[in-house]
Design a protein with these regions (language model features):
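Dynamic helix-loop-helix/coil hinge segments at AAA+ ATPase domain boundaries and subdomain interfaces
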Residues: 9-12, 17, 61-82
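Interdomain "pre-motor" coupling segment immediately N-terminal to P-loop NTPase/helicase cores
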Residues: 16-67
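Conserved P-loop
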Residues: 82-160, 207
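Walker B motif beta-strand of ABC-family P-loop ATPases
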Residues: 163
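Solvent-exposed alpha-helical segments within well-ordered globular domains of core cellular machineries
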Residues: 8, 20-23, 38-42, 58, ...
Length: 248
């Protein structure tokens, strides 16, 4: 049987995994020892693996994570009081299934962004979609989106993603426009999707960051009350690495 037409049709159908696997089988001298069902099973398995790999790459590309991080590489030896049991519990992504939130709080340099990106990367590996933003940049971009007509489209994209990562919460107090934008984002996601926030500011001071008592209650009610909290302390890891490099 001529295989070239089969290879061409697999290419047209975009069955790239099956195509590669069939080409590999054609080079195996003992492949005829396998039954038709066994060979077909190998082809289908390769196609499924190939498609999942491509979907994962797409999810990671769209997530735009700031750091290449994964939960397996998290350093629990650094003295920053990272609750390993809680973090590994979050790494199983059950909180995403339950539409809960996560807050990572701690001083600068203790690895908040890395931990957030590691959890987001794990979510992508588990089949969830994710989006990473530095909150100050997101709020600035939303202001621009209102001016050029993209606001509704951007907000829709944010509302639909399974995990929204908002990094650097509370670097500055929110102005009126930003308070309303943030409330709209959290209202659209409350009870439906999960949000992960990192901040140098302790949660007890977040009312001051929002800078409006009524809207602060509304925003924090949708964000904090169903959230897991990772509270970190300790010396900056960036500073520590810098000191080590200077002594090398």
């Amino acid at each position: 049987m001529l295989t070239q037409p089969i290879l061409e049709n697999l290419q047209k159908l975009r069955f790239y995994g099956m195509l590669t696997a069939l080409e590999e089988q054609m080079q195996m001298p003992d492949i005829d020892k396998l039954s038709f069902e066994e060979r077909m099973g190998l082809l289908v398995d390769r196609e499924m693996t190939d498609r999942e790999d491509r979907r994962l790459k797409t999810r990671l590309r769209k997530a735009k994570l700031r750091q290449q991080a994964c939960v397996e590489d998290v350093d629990f030896r650094h003295p920053r009081k990272l609750d390993k049991r809680l973090f590994m519990s979050l790494a199983d992504c059950r909180w995403l299934k339950e539409h809960n939130n996560t807050l990572i709080i701690g001083p600068t340099g203790v690895g908040k962004t890395y931990l957030a990106c590691a959890l987001a990367q794990k979510a992508c590996r588990e089949g969830y979609t994710a989006l990473y933003f530095r909150l100050p940049r997101l709020l600035h971009d939303l202001s621009i989106a209102k001016a050029d007509g993209r606001y509704d489209k951007v907000m829709m994209s944010i509302s639909r993603t399974d995990l929204l990562v908002l990094d650097d919460w509370g670097l500055d107090k929110f102005i009126k426009e930003h308070r309303h934008d943030l409330l709209e984002i959290l209202e659209d996601r409350h009870g439906l999707r999960s949000t992960l926030v990192t901040s140098q500011v302790p949660v007890k001071h977040w009312h001051e960051v929002v800078d409006d008592p009524t809207l602060a209650d509304a925003i924090l009610d949708r964000l904090v009350h169903n959230a897991y909290k990772l509270v970190l302390n300790g010396e900056s890891m960036r500073k520590k690495r810098s000191n080590v490099q200077r002594h090398i």
